[in-house]
From Swiss-Prot:
Keywords: Chloroplast, Disulfide bond, Glycosidase, Hydrolase, Plant defense, Plastid, Transit peptide. It catalyses: avenacoside B + H2O = 26-desgluco-avenacoside B + D-glucose. It is an enzyme of class 3 (hydrolase). The active site is at E239, E454. InterPro entries: Glyco_hydro_1 (IPR001360), Glyco_hydro_1_N_CS (IPR033132), Glycoside_hydrolase_SF (IPR017853). Residues 1-57 form a transit peptide. One of its GO terms (cellular component) is chloroplast stroma. Its EC number is 3.2.1.188. PANTHER family: 4-HYDROXY-7-METHOXY-3-OXO-3,4-DIHYDRO-2H-1,4-BENZOXAZIN-2-YL GLUCOSIDE BETA-D-GLUCOSIDASE 1, CHLOROPLASTIC (PTHR10353:SF326), GLYCOSYL HYDROLASE (PTHR10353). It is found in: Plastid, Chloroplast stroma. GO terms for biological process: carbohydrate metabolic process; defense response. The keyword Heme does not apply. This is Avenacosidase 2.
């Protein structure tokens, strides 16, 4: 097994001991580590070569044989299959129903040039008015669960409890929950999916200030209080790694901050420090919220966790330094937020390389952080190669040089791509990577219960390779889902505790800085025909996979007062309820 300690030793890689790395990083770890962890101090470990080599012929060969195509009965009856979405990406009604403005409202309206197609989410998929159609699609496809997010400024328009609760927003989510439950669909709620109340950005720069911890905890408590009788599965934060890096490092996402001289909406930030400050405050808000939930709202059957965005990593070349770069890529991508919840502090490599720019936890904060999850959510799409880079005075320090590895290449040192190109520029299909990540969670992080909370690929409007002629014909998505479900099954057979899979996404939506150019939905949204929902071939395959027959669905939906045919017709004809 490769040891990170050896990569950071005085004799092996002096480039790591640069001005960026702290001179006494191991002592820093001892000062900050949770007492229960000090007796267990170890270097970070990779998967053993034997474990990494356990690749099935199904994942190696690319296309699955007919007998390798996954089936529902491969998985335990209690294994959940669902689809996912996010409030900002689908709801629309950006200034209706008492909702306050969000950071993304501000970003899209004031910096439209930062969205590739110049669009915004003002209407999005119109789900605020057409949520019953979304539930109908879930039911018809046979999904047993739905992961969606609550818009913080729709609940607290000013971002704070003192600013008042918006009861129209409470009613909207209660109506959605009632509709889901009536149709036998379990809700999984994400409390924060990147749409920070703009009022908090104006008041104190939102997640850059510790006051966010109290305000977020207050917001989460309002949600527990009003929806807790209907919701047993909670997620505090979605993809903190992406949130910190894209919103406060590169500025590609709202609020759009980056360092002076960089190309972003607001080049008045500090890309070397602010992402770590935001991540630290986010972890503190998570810990406080979980503490409140477990003390007052969890009961016997509730559970709460955080969702991590992960990539799989392979060494760029067959050499020691690239293998260590692979280690660091895992630390900086997954360990940044998971290790504080497992052992009470950031990974040793981060303490070493980021130095005093990485905040410290107090003892009481560590005590709340450790074991502050009942499950871990994993969003997995693709993989990269990790290549070591030397840290030297000639390199201009920035967020993506802190980790001393580079992952811009889709190809390895021999020019071999990590997987097939699916048309979406950043997604190359690599199902083996999902299996490897799940086994890594088992061997390195104590095998926590895991839900695959996002997994899917996108169609590209005008960017496809080759371009799509029929938006409903998505064979690459079907193949992608089949291969990744097979990878999950193989990881389960090797002992990984995986409990569910959510396809991203249920419907085509507003895809952040890409606007509407990329379509991740298994259901097509016809924006020229009243936002009509139409199942793609992938949805029809999932319907068959789930064993949902047309006769059963029609019978159930026909009896549903929530999603009756008359209501559906009215909503399609009158999307704004007029």
């Amino acid at each position: 097994m490769a040891l990170l300690c050896s990569a950071l030793s005085n004799s092996t890689h002096p480039s790591f001991r640069s001005h960026i790395a702290g001179a006494n990083s191991e002592n820093l770890w001892h000062l900050s580590a949770h007492p229960a962890q000090k007796s267990k101090r170890r270097c970070n470990l990779t998967l053993s070569s034997r474990a990494a080599a356990r690749i099935s012929s199904a994942l190696e060969s690319g296309k699955l044989k007919p007998w390798q195509i996954p089936k529902r009965d491969w998985f335990p009856p209690e294994f959940t299959f669902g689809a996912a979405s996010a409030a900002y990406q689908i709801e629309g009604a950006w200034n209706e129903g008492g909702k306050g403005p969000s950071s993304w409202d501000n970003f899209c309206h004031n910096y439209p040039e930062r969205i590739m197609d110049g669009s915004n989410w003002d209407v999005a998929a119109n789900s605020y008015y057409m949520y019953k159609e979304d539930v109908r699609m879930l039911k018809e496809i046979g999904m047993d669960s739905y992961r969606f997010s609550i818009s913080w400024p729709r609940i607290l328009p000013e971002g704070t409890l003192e600013g008042g609760i918006n009861h129209e927003g409470i009613q909207y989510y209660n109506d959605l929950l009632d509709c889901l439950i009536e149709n036998g669909i379990k809700p999984y709620i994400t409390l924060f999916h990147w749409d920070t109340p703009q009022a908090l950005a104006d008041k104190y720069n939102d997640f850059l200030d510790r006051r966010i911890v109290k305000d977020y905890t207050d917001y989460a408590t309002v949600c527990f209080e009003h929806f807790g009788d209907k919701v047993k599965n909670w997620i505090t934060f979605n993809e903190p790694h992406s949130f910190c890096g894209l919103a406060y490092g590169t500025g590609l996402h709202a609020p759009g901050l980056c360092s002076p001289g960089m190309d972003c909406a607001i080049p008045q930030g500090d890309a070397l420090r602010q992402p770590y400050i935001v991540g630290h405050n986010l972890l503190l808000a998570h810990a406080e919220t979980v503490d409140v939930y477990k003390k007052f709202y969890k009961g016997d059957d509730g559970q709460i966790g955080m969702v991590m965005d992960v990539m799989a990593y392979e060494p760029y070349g067959n050499n020691f330094v690239d293998q260590q770069a692979q280690e660091r890529s895992i630390d900086f991508h997954i360990g940044w937020f998971l290790e504080p919840m497992v052992r009470g502090d950031y990974p040793f490599s981060m303490r070493s390389l980021v130095g005093d720019r990485l905040p410290f936890f107090t003892k009481s904060e560590q005590e709340k952080l450790v074991s502050s999850y009942d499950f871990v959510g994993i969003n997995y799409y693709t993989a990269r190669f990790s290549e070591h880079i030397d840290i030297s005075p000639e390199i201009i320090p920035k967020l993506n040089t802190d980790d001393a590895y580079s992952t811009p290449e889709f190809n390895d040192s021999n020019g071999i791509p990590i997987g097939p190109d699916l048309g979406m520029y950043w997604i190359l299909s690599y199902p083996k990577g999902l299996k490897d990540i799940l086994l890594l969670m088992k061997e390195k992080y104590g095998n926590p219960p895991i839900y695959i909370t996002e997994n899917g690929t996108a169609d590209m409007d005008g960017w496809g390779n080759p371009p799509m002629t029929d938006p409903l014909d998505d064979p690459l998505r079907i193949e992608y889902l089949q291969q990744h479900m097979t990878a999950i099954k193989e990881a389960i057979d090797l002992g990984a505790d995986v409990r569910g899979h959510f396809t991203w996404s249920l419907i085509d939506n507003f895809e952040w800085s890409m606007g509407y150019l990329s379509r991740f939905g298994i259901v097509y949204i016809d924006r020229n025909d009243g936002f009509k929902r139409i199942m793609k071939k992938s949805a029809k395959w999932l319907k068959e996979f789930n064993g949902a027959t047309k006769e059963v669905n029609n019978k159930i939906l026909g009896a549903s007062s929530c999603c009756s045919g008359e209501l559906m017709w009215f909503l399609v004809q009158n999307p704004y309820g007029k």
